[in-house]
């Protein structure tokens, strides 16, 4: 529970922010147990997630913890006010995390258009937890070629906006299928993975259908598409439940806040609003100058 009342934020981020600040010592106590990485998951657009998540993230990062934000932004049908509030929260969150994954619920609707509304919201929540679990499993599961905490930290530390996706392949060319499946995921938010600065990917297969040397050429071909300045980490993992399939998971960082869908318009709007505010301030100052001049004469302007 954040704050002393436990009554929710009433769609007011400032109330949730105050509650989080009130509970700061409890938050620090919870994090101060040898924690090396914290996932801050939230639904942006309401009060609690939008207001409290950035405060919790800021606290974790200041404690030296690798801090990863994983947030959703609203469906279009939830309205512009909630969307704008969500994008404000995303922008604030980006200032206080090492890496930020933004899941656009509207992209999920494109994939699961036949879902009921309740099931769609449930899928959004599942996607949050799946993303956190996938990152954690890269560290905790054993593989043929392992990736450890430091590998993940290298990619996520000061990584900016991140994107993550998983794809599957089966049969002839299954590795290429899995890679293409991941690269065409709506969760990538139309970002070009090859514009990332750091990338980590994992190929998972079943021992019942071993990964062949020829298939490694498909992995090499994918890796060769990245520029020489892009830092890449990769691993091979085993999952018996895949049977004859392979799974390809990719995590890329180094994108900017403008790469979040809808953020460009918010920032442009904010720039226009700021320009208008400055013009209004200038007009107000001019009005005051003229008023002083009316009462004290024009020389008052030179004093």
What are these regions (language model features)?
Residues 1-303:
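Tubulin/FtsZ superfamily GTPase core signature
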């Amino acid at each position: 529970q954040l704050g002393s009342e436990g009554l929710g934020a009433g769609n007011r981020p400032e109330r949730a922010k105050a509650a989080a600040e009130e509970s700061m010592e409890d938050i620090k106590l919870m994090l101060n147990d040898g924690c090396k990485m914290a996932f801050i998951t939230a639904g942006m657009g309401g009060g609690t997630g939008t207001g409290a998540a950035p405060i919790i993230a800021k606290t974790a990062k200041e404690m030296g913890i690798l801090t990863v934000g994983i947030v959703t932004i609203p469906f279009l049908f939830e309205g512009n006010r909630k969307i704008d509030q969500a994008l404000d929260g995303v922008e604030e969150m980006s200032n206080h995390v090492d890496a930020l994954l933004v899941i656009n619920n509207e992209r999920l609707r494109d994939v699961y258009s036949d879902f009921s509304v309740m099931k769609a919201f449930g899928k959004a929540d599942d996607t949050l937890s799946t993303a956190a679990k996938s990152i954690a499993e890269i560290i905790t599961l054993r593989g043929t070629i392992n990736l450890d905490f430091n590998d993940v930290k290298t990619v996520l530390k000061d990584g900016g906006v991140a994107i993550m996706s998983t794809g599957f392949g089966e049969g002839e060319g299954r590795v290429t299928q899995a890679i293409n499946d991941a690269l065409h995921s709506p969760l990538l938010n139309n970002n070009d993975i090859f514009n990332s600065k750091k990338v980590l990917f994992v190929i998972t297969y079943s021992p019942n259908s071993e990964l062949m040397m020829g298939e490694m050429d498909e992995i090499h071909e994918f890796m060769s598409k990245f520029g020489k300045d892009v830092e890449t980490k990769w691993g091979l993992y085993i999952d018996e439940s895949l049977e004859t399939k392979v799974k390809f998971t990719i995590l890329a960082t180094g994108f900017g806040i403008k790469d979040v869908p809808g953020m460009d318009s918010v920032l442009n709007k904010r720039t226009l609003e700021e320009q208008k505010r400055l013009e209004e301030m200038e007009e107000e100052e001019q009005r005051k100058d003229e008023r002083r001049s009316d009462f004290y004469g024009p020389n008052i302007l030179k004093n």
